[in-house]
Structure formats: structure tokens, C-alpha cells
């Protein structure tokens, strides 16, 4: 039972007045950049805030993210913060019954500005400040780390006194830079040498380049894994500082897609490492959600949800695309996709476009409305989707993504291995050529076309998963650590089946290979939990469920907008009843369940997407 309090997050689910609700979120002054604001300093910030909040409340927004922008004073070991705008935001939102999360870190909130605190690249050049690179200090620099911890604690303590503050965000889009290799700060190298000495290797120097084709990749792998571990440990450490100030406020960060895409080993961030320690897996997502890119959009969400689920937790879209030039169709499609991947909250970025300064980073670039409050093209459709989430939120938010019985291995070791052997002299993360990442993308797409969403898992958690896997797909046979290989063998001893993707044959090789490769559909048919399918190749189905009911998110991801007439969905799971509820935008209708040779439901008209609610049998 959840205690009835005005606002709370409990295991990633938002409760308001004791009722579980889907998080319908937005942002207001969420940035530390002085030119990323809706109202300039000389404007009527407080008057316009009240007007904006009234509009947001009318649109069913129930949670907002802001940033702890303020000033700090130090007295001995105590840091005090002053946040007049943030304080006013918290108070005004509480008056209208809206929850608040606070981003506690901007651009390294250190107060001492140590001369040696910056990250260094492979040429010992300090990282240059950039508005979109939020962590610039070495995460191993004790002085900078301590300063950030103290400031994080001070911010959390200040905002923790507001009853509607339910969550704390640690940094924004944290990762090593896209360009160059990091971090070669002396403090990082010293920590690396200590770690290697504990393994029996004295005076180990980190490599400054990837190995040549005839060199051992292991030194590079060890160095990248060390940096990733330290980077994510740093985020988790700051999360603990925030948590110590308000234990019932849930912690999260807002990761980009980089943990599971090309360049992941260079950038260091990892969903699983953060999921293990923080309360929520939070992410940013601006990928296109139509056409061929739809699968990558879905894959990133499913990986984030999987990382959370492995530890019995949930994921949120802390920033979801709401560009001012976004079409109504794009907004609707991405929302149905997010619902189906199991998000417990969507915080569309943002409510109002940034004020247009002469040198604004993103003037009027993101928002439901433009800075002058002119509605964007998507505005009316966005409000309809908000209303859908408001009306159906309790039917959605307490359901979990269906665990369909087939996993895909996530391996940081393999990511580092393929970074070492595939990327040569490339120093730009987005130009990566890691073969295993391309294999992952191909494998995910194959199973998605069988209407099976793969569950991403690490080898280290295979023996203690809170859900059952009958089969595990390994994207590439090479590049695994000895520990991972041992865990795969134990998984098979416990009755699981391991398949290795063969890129050459575009099929799968069982671990006990006896001359026959198998196709994705064969694995899906034998080991997958099939819920439903549809013949249209540009329609996807995603599945949520509780003990009594399925929620099937139906997504039309075709490039161009269309209306599909009489879309027939075949049901493979056992269901009961003669009809089922279908909700799409403002439309609500009951559809007949046809029980002939096949059990089907026909949607008379589908435009962009919708949700079917069907009772389990």
C-alpha cells in the first residue's frame, strides 16, 4: 500500500494524493545556461510563470523539471545556496498541485576552481567548455569531486523542504565528450595505476591510442572499462549525496542514447551501472520515430527499460522530443511508442520555447508553444495526447512491459573490444564502426518484426533476473570477457539457450552448433511469448500487462501520415470477453473480439496509433 501523501515517487511511479498517475511532464527553467530561458532577467519572470503554469495545469501536466540555478556562499565546511526563482517555482507548483523534480548539477558546481581539475584528452589538452558538455572536470579529482558533492547536498537540502519535490536529477546528459579520448587527468591516471597494481601490474600507463591490428586490444579494453566504471560511480556517488538530504525523493540522471549506440565505449555512460544504484533510469530521446529509424528509437527505450527492470525499477523519458517544428503526427507516434516501451513518465522538452537572444544556443527550438505563446503545429494534438494519458494513466502506469522470454546480451567488454579493433584512428564517437553495435541493431529489428521486444541483460545478472528468459542472443561471439563466457555457460546449465548472431549468414548459431543455423522467427516461435501480430509491415505492437489485462500499444511508424482502414490484429495470447477497449487520442470505442479460426480484433480506422485494453484469460 502507498501512504496517501500529496506527492511522491515510489519505485519510479508518480503518486498524487495516493493515486498512481502517469507522469505527464514538462520543463521550466531546466537549464543552467543563462541564454536558455523563457523570460530574460529583466522580464516579468514571476508574472509570466503563473500564466505558464496555469496553462500547463490545464493541459494535465502533473510534474515539472527545473534546475537549481542560484548562488552559493561558503562558511567553513558549510555551503548555503540561494535559489529565489527555483523557490518561487516550487511554491507556485505546489499551489496548483503539480509535482517537481530538480536538476542539481549544471556545469560542474565546484566552488574552488582548481587549476588541474579539467579532463585531459590523449594529448594532455584540457577539455574546452561547451554549453552541451555538462561534465568537464575529471571525475577522479578529489577536490572537484568533493566540491560537487557538497554543492549537490546543499541544493538537495534546500529543495528537499518543499513537499512537492519528488525527485533529484544528477547532471544532464552525462558522458565523456564526443570528440577525443578521455580522461588523462593525472588524478585519473593515478587511480588507474592503483587499480592495475591491485591486479599485479605495476606502473601501468594508460594507452593513448587504439591498438594496431597486430597488437593486443586488452590494454585499451581495460582503460575504457576503468573510465566507464569511474564515470558512473561518480554519478551514483552524487546521487547518494542528494538522497541523504531527502530519502523519499527518487534519484536519476538523464542519459542520452550513447550507452547503447556507436561510440558507447568512448563516452562511458551506462544504463545498467546507474540503474543498479539510482532509483530511476532517466534518459533523453530525440531520435526520429518513423520509418527505418523507428527501430532504433524503440531499441534505445527498450534497453533503458530493461536495465531498470533487471533491478526491479522503472524508466522515465526525462527529455522527450517536443521541438517547435515537430508535426502532430510525430508527437503522437512517439508517445504511443513510449507508452508501449513501459515508460512511467514522459517529460516533453519543453513547455515554452527559449527566449531569442542574439546568441541563444536553441532560440525557440523546443516547446509546446513558441516563446511568444503562439501554439506550435502539434499543440492541439499534444493536448489530446496529454488528455489520453490523464484519462488512461491509471490503466497504463501500473502495468509492466511484457517479458517475452528472449534476451540480448549487453556487454561493456565487447563494446570496448570492438571499439579497439574497428575504429582505428577515429576520434569522433558518432563516426564509430563497432561491428557489435551494428549486429545489435540488426538483431533487435529482426525480433521486433516478429513482435518480440528483446530484453537487454548483462551476463552478471543472468543468475538473478526477476523475470524468466528461455533464450539469450549474443550479438557477436568475440569480445566477451572470461567472466561473461562463464555466466553464459551457467545460463545454459540452468536450462537457457544461447544463440550467437552470424552476420555473414544473417542468422543465428546455437552454442551447441551441429551444422544448422536458425532464423529469428524460429527462435521467437520456440522461446518467445507471443501476444499479438499484425500484417501491415509499418505497424508495430508493444505489450504491457498486469495480472488481469493487456495494454497493446499500436504504432503506425510509416514515414508519411495515413489512415489505415480495418486494421486486423491477430491475438495469440489467451484473452476473454466479447469486446475490448480502444483509445486513440480523444477517441474511445469498444471493438468486437472475433473468435473464428483465429482470434482477431479489427480497428476500423487507425491514424498514428492507439491503445487496446484486452482482458486476460
Q: Where are the regions a protein language model picked out?
A:
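Hydrophobic faces of well-ordered beta-strands that scaffold small-molecule active sites
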Residues: 22-26, 64-66, 100-104, 166-170, ...
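Conserved, mostly hydrophobic/aromatic
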Residues: 18, 56, 155, 168, ...
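Carbohydrate-binding surfaces of carbohydrate-active enzymes
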Residues: 289-617
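N-terminal carbohydrate-binding accessory modules
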Residues: 1-58
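Polysaccharide-binding and catalytic clefts of secreted carbohydrate-active enzymes
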Residues: 122-297
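The substrate-binding groove and active-site-proximal loops of carbohydrate-active enzymes
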Residues: 29-46, 67-83, 130-149, 216-233, ...
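Short, acidic/polar
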Residues: 38-56, 148-155, 262-274, 327-335, ...
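Aromatic-lined substrate-binding rim segments of carbohydrate-active enzymes
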Residues: 46-124, 230-245
Amino acid at each position: 500500500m502507498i501512504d496517501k501523501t500529496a506527492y511522491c515517487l515510489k519505485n519510479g511511479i508518480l503518486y498524487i494524493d495516493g493515486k498512481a498517475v502517469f507522469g505527464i511532464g514538462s520543463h521550466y527553467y531546466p537549464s543552467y545556461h543563462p541564454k536558455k530561458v523563457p523570460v530574460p532577467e529583466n522580464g516579468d519572470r514571476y508574472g509570466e510563470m503563473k500564466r505558464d503554469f496555469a496553462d500547463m495545469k490545464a493541459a494535465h501536466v502533473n510534474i515539472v523539471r527545473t534546475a537549481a540555478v542560484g548562488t552559493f556562499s561558503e562558511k567553513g565546511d558549510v555551503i548555503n545556496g540561494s535559489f529565489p526563482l527555483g523557490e518561487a517555482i516550487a511554491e507556485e507548483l505546489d499551489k496548483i498541485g503539480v509535482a517537481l523534480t530538480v536538476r542539481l548539477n549544471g556545469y560542474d558546481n565546484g566552488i574552488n576552481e582548481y587549476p588541474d581539475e579539467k579532463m585531459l584528452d590523449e594529448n594532455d589538452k584540457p577539455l574546452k567548455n561547451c554549453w552541451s558538455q555538462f561534465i568537464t572536470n575529471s571525475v577522479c579529482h578529489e577536490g572537484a569531486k568533493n566540491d560537487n558533492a557538497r554543492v549537490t547536498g546543499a541544493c538537495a537540502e534546500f529543495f528537499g523542504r518543499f513537499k512537492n519535490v519528488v525527485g533529484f536529477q544528477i547532471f544532464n546528459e552525462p558522458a565523456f565528450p564526443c570528440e577525443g579520448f578521455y580522461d588523462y587527468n593525472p588524478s585519473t591516471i593515478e587511480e588507474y595505476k592503483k587499480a592495475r597494481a591491485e591486479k599485479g601490474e605495476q606502473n601501468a600507463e594508460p594507452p593513448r591510442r587504439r591498438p594496431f591490428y597486430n597488437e593486443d586490444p586488452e590494454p585499451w579494453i581495460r582503460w575504457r572499462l576503468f573510465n566507464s566504471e569511474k564515470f558512473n560511480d561518480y554519478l551514483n556517488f552524487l546521487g547518494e549525496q542528494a538522497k541523504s538530504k531527502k530519502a523519499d525523493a527518487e534519484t536519476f540522471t538523464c542519459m542520452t542514447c550513447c550507452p547503447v549506440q556507436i561510440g558507447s565505449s568512448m563516452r562511458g555512460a551506462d544504463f545498467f551501472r546507474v540503474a543498479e544504484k539510482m532509483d530511476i533510469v532517466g534518459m533523453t530521446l530525440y531520435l526520429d520515430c518513423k520509418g527505418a529509424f523507428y527501430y532504433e528509437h524503440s531499441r534505445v527505450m527498450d534497453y533503458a527499460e530493461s536495465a531498470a527492470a533487471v533491478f526491479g525499477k522503472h524508466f522515465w523519458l526525462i527529455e522527450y522530443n517536443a521541438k517547435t517544428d515537430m508535426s502532430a503526427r510525430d508527437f503522437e507516434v512517439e508517445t504511443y511508442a513510449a507508452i508501449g516501451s513501459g515508460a512511467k513518465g514522459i517529460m516533453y522538452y519543453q513547455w515554452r520555447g527559449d527566449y531569442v537572444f542574439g546568441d541563444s544556443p536553441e532560440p525557440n527550438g523546443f516547446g509546446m508553444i513558441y516563446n511568444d505563446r503562439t501554439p506550435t503545429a502539434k499543440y492541439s494534438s499534444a493536448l489530446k495526447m496529454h488528455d489520453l494519458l490523464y484519462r488512461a494513466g491509471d490503466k497504463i502506469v501500473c502495468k509492466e512491459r511484457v517479458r517475452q522470454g528472449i534476451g540480448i546480451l549487453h556487454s561493456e567488454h565487447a563494446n570496448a573490444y570492438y571499439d579497439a579493433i574497428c575504429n582505428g584512428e577515429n576520434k569522433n564517437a558518432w563516426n564509430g564502426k563497432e561491428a557489435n553495435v551494428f549486429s545489435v541493431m540488426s538483431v533487435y529489428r529482426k525480433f521486433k518484426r516478429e513482435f518480440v521486444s528483446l530484453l537487454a541483460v548483462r551476463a552478471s545478472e543472468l543468475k538473478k533476473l526477476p523475470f524468466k528468459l528461455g533464450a539469450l542472443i549474443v550479438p557477436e561471439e568475440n569480445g566477451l570477457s572470461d567472466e561473461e563466457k562463464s555466466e553464459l555457460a551457467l545460463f545454459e546449465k540452468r536450462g537457457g539457450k544461447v544463440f550467437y548472431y552470424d552476420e555473414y549468414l544473417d542468422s543465428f548459431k546455437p552454442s551447441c552448433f551441429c551444422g544448422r543455423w536458425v532464423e529469428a522467427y524460429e527462435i521467437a516461435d520456440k522461446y518467445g511469448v507471443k501476444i499479438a501480430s499484425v500484417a501491415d509491415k509499418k505497424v508495430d505492437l508493444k505489450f504491457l500487462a498486469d495480472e488481469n489485462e493487456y495494454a497493446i500499444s499500436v504504432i503506425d511508424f510509416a514515414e508519411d501520415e495515413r489512415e489505415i482502414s480495418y486494421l486486423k490484429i491477430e491475438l495469440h495470447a489467451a484473452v476473454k470477453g466479447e469486446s475490448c477497449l480502444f483509445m486513440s487520442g480523444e477517441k474511445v470505442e469498444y471493438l468486437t473480439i472475433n473468435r473464428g479460426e483465429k482470434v482477431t480484433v479489427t480497428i476500423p480506422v487507425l491514424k498514428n496509433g492507439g491503445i487496446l485494453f484486452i482482458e486476460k484469460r
